Amino acid sequence: MKRIRVISLAVIAALSLTVTSFAAEKSPQQSAAAYLSEAGIMLGNESSDMMLEQGLTRAQMAALLTRIVTDPEQFETDSAFYRSLCSFTDVPEWAKSYVGYCVANNLVAGYGNGRYGSNDPVTSAAACTVMLRCLNDVDAVWDYQSACRTAVQLGLAAEETVADAEITRGNMAVLICHTLARRGYDVKLSETAQPNLSVNGTSDAAAVQETAE
């Protein structure tokens, strides 16, 4: 009986360690967001909460896109010029240079009638569309309707991350990291399929307001 009890305690201890190990693991969304936060690409709120289960707005998406594809110092130098290119009437002041840059580089477009839809949520199709536009090596023929399917086929996203009508900030973070990898960044996945990300020879983008509306 004593031996059985010792073995049982050992099993319980092992199970406890296993549970602790699993609890310490980060999800792909958490790992991707942590990297993007350190790089100054995706920011959280005043409490440093990345709000991974929440959506993001089209204004926030423009900021993310700009930080991915442009040199931060050059963008800062030309920010007034890009701000002047933003003719939409519904873009907040902090986002005008980002939206102007994205429009000038054919990454985003407005709705017409002077509206960009700054506060509108980003759909999964829109998220995949802009990420595909960030790439210059996509041979597949795609459009807005097939953007999610194309992104999955190219390995930019898992099917479940773009299955909902609107994309979450966490799934957007994963999508961005896979896009960065395809753009030549040194992005590695660990054996547990959690992103282990590093960037060589690149500058962190400037951090500006990107809190949730």
Regions found by a protein language model. Name each.
Residues 176-177:
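Extracellular, beta-strand-rich glycan-interacting domains
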Residues 172:
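Short, well-ordered, aromatic-rich surface patches in folded extracellular/luminal domains
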